[in-house]
A protein has these predicted regions:
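Bacterial N-terminal signal peptides that target proteins for export
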Residues: 1-9
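Hydrophobic helical h-region of N-terminal Sec-dependent signal peptides
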Residues: 9-17
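Sec/Tat signal peptide C-region and signal peptidase I cleavage site
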Residues: 18-24
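Substrate-binding/active-site clefts of carbohydrate-active enzymes
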Residues: 24-137
Length: 137
């Protein structure tokens, strides 16, 4: 029983430090913004960079952040979580690199931040299981 109580006390102390850890991640302590997820699965036609950019005036009064899908090239129409290039090709199923930059710029002018959805351990290959394209980092 004594061991159980010590374990519970340790957990309670750890939980007590969670608010301190959460506030140390760069967010203002009284942040009141709301984030919009600007995509859903297989939404590459509905959530093109140009379509999201055209909605900036409608979004600005209500949202401080827009979460957008990843922007790397994946070799075809997909959500892009099998991307081939992380650093050298930003032409994705959602539009071109220039359209992405334009959307981010417009959002910034309207006071909207942009957060990219990136799954760093997902990567597609060119031909087979281990044939990753080379990139310059």
């Amino acid at each position: 029983m004594n061991r159980f109580l010590k374990s519970m006390a340790a957990i309670a102390c750890g939980v007590g430090f969670l608010p301190l850890n959460a506030s140390a991640q760069g967010w203002p302590s009284q942040y009141q913004g709301v984030m919009l997820q600007g995509f859903y699965w297989d939404s590459f036609d509905a959530s093109q960079w140009t379509k999201l950019e055209s909605q900036a005036d409608e979004l600005a009064p209500y949202f401080k952040l827009v979460w957008v899908p990843q922007s790397a090239y994946c070799g075809g129409k997909s959500m892009g979580y099998n991307d081939l290039y992380w650093f050298t090709n930003y032409n994705s199923s959602f539009g071109t690199e220039q359209e992405l930059r334009s959307m981010i710029g417009t959002f910034k002018q309207k006071g909207i931040g942009t957060i990219a959805d990136v799954v760093i351990n997902h990567r597609g290959t060119v031909k087979n299981w281990f044939d990753f394209p080379e990139e310059t980092y």
